[in-house]
Amino acid sequence: MSPKPSENGIDGDDERDEEEEDSEEEEAEEEEEDEPRLKYQRMGASVPSLLSADAATCIAVAERMIALGTHGGAVHILDFLGNQVKEFAAHTAAVNDLCFDTDGEYVGSCSDDGSVVINSLFTDERMKFEYHRPMKAIALDPDYARTSSRRFVTGGLAGQLYLNVKKWLGYRDQVLHSGEGPIHAVKWRTSLVAWANDTGVKVYDASNDQRITFIERPRGIPRPELLLPHIVWQDDSLLVIGWGTSVKIALIRTTQSKGANGTYKHMSMSSLNQVDIVASFQTSYFISGIAPFGDSLVILAYIPGEEDGEKDFSSTIPSRQGNAQRPEVRVVTWNNDELATDALPVHGFEHYKAKDYSLAHAPFSGSSYAGGQWAAGDEPLYYIVSPKDVVIAKPRDAEDHINWLLQHGWHEKALEAVEANQGQSELLDEVGSRYLDHLIVERKYAEAASLCPKLLRGSASAWERWVFHFAHLRQLPVLVPYIPTENPRLRDTAYEVALVALATNPSFHKDLLSTVKSWPPRIYSTTPVFSAIEPQINTSSMTDPLKEALAELYVIDGQHDKAFALYADLMKPDLFDFIEKHNLHDAVREKVLQLMMIDCKRAVLLLIQQRDLIPPSEVVSQLIAARDKCDYRYFLHLYLHSLFEVNLHAGKDYHDMQVELYADYDPKMLLTFLRSSQHYTLEKAYEICVKKDLLKEQVFILGRMGNAKQALAVIINRLGDIEEAIEFVSMQQDDELWEELIQQSFHKPEMVGVLLEHTVGNLDPLYIVNMLPNDLEIPRLRDRLVKIVTDYRTETSLRHGCNDILKADCVNLLVKYYKEAKRGVCLSDEVDDVSSRRGEKSVSHLGERTMSLKSVEVKSKTRGGGRCCICFDPFSILNVSIIAFFCCHAYHTTCLMESSISVGGKKEAGVAAQRTTSYDEYPNGVNDDYEDEDEEEEEEEDATSGALPMRCILCTTAAG
């Protein structure tokens, strides 16, 4: 495995031998490198100066401080940074073991001088106990500061384990065990005390003064004084033992006994404790220290050389050969699966043996461990002690994990780790920047661009920096789709640079179009983009997407006419809506062909509506000029046909062309066109119809040309339609043509029969019958003759009926005219209401004639040339009412009234006076039955107004 990165001067290295075989080195390089589980830091502050003149032997860790023992017999109290807080000159020989109580108020130490010293950290209290033999291990009661018994256990080379308890009369030692060799280690947890001697590990319950179990010393390992055993409580029930090359984990279980009443009764631990070995494995290295690491283990490993053996361990003096391996920190599972291995280059490691190293840990908040990670501040600390070094190891946190991933090029995993741990924005920025730099170096520009929204987030400055960086690398087009337009909004220059980069690269013209459509126009200026695009117009790099993008920019800039020209070239389907929206009818003039090709129907409608702006000559010339680009003749036909329907004469110059166009595209409409138009050449039209074999059209043209006989021959010989021939001859009103028709029909008896059926109203059937040859056989002749006679009678009857109706209409109209003519018109300066109403009704019935008569009378009155037909006095101009009749007689109103009364002195006159308006009889002998209803209406009107009936005296007398 490759060397681990250095942290604060400590390098991790997995090399075991600098002279390994080449094959092993290659295999190690091929293995995937595992991430370290721990990070290391050499303890500084006061420690280097302390160890420069002395050597460390052991260490103990409390919740708030550290105790370091030395060969000189001193106990140094340090904070976690290595600063010395206190110093106890406790012993005269090397300190072998240290121990804090749970509260961290007392520290106990034992030494080769045979003494045990317990010092209070916060008071001057100090107790010293002499045992006169080197003491190797000590453990304070976890509740030492809380109880008055002040218990501790200690042992050494004497082979006796002492329990020291404070009594009424002072401190008293109780020997818990003896006779099985020196006591090498002791640990106290709750009420359980575990110690190791030459035979193995034993556990004692201090609460009941009873030994619980014995765990035998592993076989095949050097003597305990050469390879010390290491024991540590992982929790209240798990005891971890590392001895030589063996690891065992013992579980001390508490069981419950069922009482007489069926309930569970809690009994004392000593009576029910059971010990199970839950894990056990062998190692390939010597164990110099062991500690729990969550649900795994941390082992301080000493790697033996080939010459290492029991003989070498017999000396406690450091080796002078200088060939020892570096100590290693290994993280393993309970099944000895290796999770991490780190070699520590401590000072002077070449000369140290396994017993020169020790390991202590501080698992104060181990309950926060979950999923391989500890909460911030709760991670355990591990202290590796060598004679001249103290190295702190602690679990790597999320930031360390991220840095390790970055150093190994796993930027994506680093980013995922940052996001999963909701890292600080500064860390995310750093990871993002390094990730992007890595991708840029690898030339993975597209991937880098896709990650920018996630990595740069809302930082406008970061976005702008990367925009210009991509631009410098000529890779800005791949970043454009991800550039934000809001939150954050960048400077206009950034967007303009992006658009220019897209515009100058034909491969990204489609992206330019989509970008222009999606970006708000307010965030950039179009001028730089115009400057980048316009030089490409009419060049090979002017692609359709670039044209459309330029058109969109013209729209944004308000240059709709330029945009229309580009849209027309691009044949955009919504071009017609664009024209209407921006009123661009003037611009249509130059783009007739494009409009026709987009949608010929809408184009024709537009051109017809705007024919004043775009004359037909312009349209026709553009379409003819495009003969190589499209079916221009079809477009011409559509346009000229619509133009002809709107205005028969608007396209008269092209009617000759239209004849041919109709013949090609719409022959059914040609005949209608020929009948409606007067602006085409008959000869040319006839040639086209002959060429296209359009028979009816030939007949029509021949008829207009005066070749009626030739037209008739076409009908009979080509069409074979005798009815059409009869209709044609009837329209020509030429007797000779009838004879021609009859003569040509004789050759076809069936035509003669049809001719006989259609002669009524046109020819005398007898004339045709007389001309028929005697031997001519006519199919269904009898039936046809019967039909001829029947049709003739029907025609005669219809004519008589029509004559009768005509006569009746004449009589009715004459009577109506006479009745209107009998009415008078009052001419006066002041006309009463009744006369006005009656005059208005008369005017409405008489129309223009009444008004003209009134004009004549007014002029006569003005001139004064008229005379009353009764008194023969001339009419005065003022203050005299005059009654004028359509018979050209006029009277003074007073004269006419007096004459009417005198003439009507008889009874009939009285009756006539009571009626409003009536006529006794008409001069022509027609009675009043024709207009009874009209007269009744007239009488009702006169009766309502109270006026007397007015009649021309002269005409009435003459009629009588």
Curated annotation (Swiss-Prot):
Residues 1-39, 917-948 are annotated as: Disordered. Signal peptide: none annotated. Residues 10-35, 928-943 have a biased composition (Acidic residues). SUPFAM superfamilies: WD40 repeat-like. One of its GO terms (biological process) is macroautophagy. It comes from the Eukaryota. WD repeats lie at residues 90-132, 178-214. GO terms for cellular component: HOPS complex; late endosome. The keyword RNA-binding does not apply. InterPro entries: Clathrin_H-chain/VPS_repeat (IPR000547), TPR-like_helical_dom_sf (IPR011990), VPS41 (IPR016902), Vps41/Vps8 (IPR045111), WD40/YVTN_repeat-like_dom_sf (IPR015943), WD40_repeat_dom_sf (IPR036322), WD40_rpt (IPR001680). Keywords: Protein transport, Repeat, Transport, WD repeat. CHCR repeats lie at residues 607-754. Required for vacuolar assembly and vacuolar traffic. Belongs to the VPS41 family. This is Vacuolar protein sorting-associated protein 41 homolog. It comes from Solanum lycopersicum (Tomato). The lineage of its organism: Eukaryota, Viridiplantae, Streptophyta, Embryophyta, Tracheophyta.
